[in-house]
Amino acid sequence: MEETKDGWVPDTTLFCFDRNRNIFVGAVNIRHYLNDKLLKTGGHIGDGVRPSERKKGYATAMIGLALNECKRLGINKVLICCDKDNIGSAKSIINNGGILENEVEENGHIEQRYWIQL
């Protein structure tokens, strides 16, 4: 696979929708491989949950589904990063087997880097 000229890599986006309440809950993006920038900060998976739906387990579930898709794509070791201050994201990553490797600082911002072996 080849990186595009603008630095983007191929990706897959999955959406979480609550059919019972007819609302969009969140989304998770899976980057098929990492370029140098994503290896430092960003990682394979990024997710977002609607503010009104946070702290309900959706992020943990979405990351779990994304990890299944990573396995299907042949990604055996997955990097997921989050803001050091985002305790909820860190818990969702850890609940899916994430192991903190380190923290990196970029432009005054500290990001935690977690790896998950599939």
Residue map of PLM features:
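Loop/helix-junction capping segments adjacent to catalytic residues or to phosphate/diphosphate-binding pockets
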Residues: 39, 56, 87
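Conserved GNAT acetyl-CoA-binding A-motif
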Residues: 70-81
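A short, internal acetyl-CoA/4′-phosphopantetheine-binding micro-motif in the GNAT/acyltransferase core
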Residues: 17, 32, 44-55, 83
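Conserved catalytic-core motifs of GNAT/GCN5-like acyltransferases
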Residues: 81-82, 94-113
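GNAT-family acyltransferases
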Residues: 1-44, 69, 107-118
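Conserved acetyl-CoA-binding loop-helix of GNAT-fold acetyltransferases
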Residues: 46-49, 55-72, 91-95
